[in-house]
Regions:
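Cell-surface, membrane-associated systems
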Residues: 15-21, 26-182
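N-terminal alpha-helical signal peptides/signal-anchor transmembrane segments
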Residues: 1-11
Length: 182
């Protein structure tokens, strides 16, 4: 269920195939004007005018993503200039979310605009991991980290789990969701 409400391009396998990490979508909508990106060469901006949207009750959006085409554009070091080609080129840290305006923590140039001018608001990453023969759910992971911190708090989802290669992912496309095999 949790994977169904995650951003397709945020699903990735980490920690030597023992963790499946993802970023849950808590809201989304359309932005009104194109955002600055590597193609339009507009100046970096820290605000985005958006259509009315509501956030899922009980959640707290941490990030906004626009035009993501792979997990490498969603995770990694914060990067506010996609022209450099490294880091989270399609993710920005959200400072505030008003009904018609998203404010970022810093001005940003995005990797690309979304084809339909869509944005998604995301929670901090979560991960399912196989640790000590348990399937565990870790919340509040660091989007800048290359791996899941399995030393933190977790919820046990199942006991006596033994598999040699627990997770595999077939990346999503514009017209097909990500496929995860357990």
């Amino acid at each position: 269920r949790q994977l169904r409400v995650s951003l397709s391009y945020s699903v990735r396998v980490t920690n030597a195939n023992t963790c499946l990490e993802f970023m849950p979508i808590v809201s989304g909508g359309n932005y009104i004007d194109p955002v600055p990106d590597t193609a339009n060469a507009a100046a970096a901006a820290s605000t985005i005018i958006v259509s009315p949207h509501s956030v899922v009750s009980g959640t707290s959006p941490q990030y906004v993503t626009i035009g993501a085409a792979s997990s490498t554009e969603v995770y990694g070091a914060n990067n506010n200039d996609a022209g450099t080609g490294v880091g989270a080129l399609s993710r920005a840290t959200l400072s505030s979310d008003a009904a018609l305006l998203l404010t970022l923590s810093a001005a940003k140039i995005w990797k690309r605009n979304s084809l339909g001018q869509h944005f998604f608001l995301l929670e901090a990453p979560k991960a399912f991991c196989i640790v000590s023969n348990q399937l565990r759910l870790y919340s509040g992971q660091d989007a800048t980290s290359a791996s899941v911190n399995t030393a933190g708090a977790y919820s046990v989802m199942a006991d006596n789990v033994t598999v040699s290669s627990p997770f595999s992912v077939s990346a999503g496309t514009e017209n097909r969701n990500t496929v995860v095999s357990f």
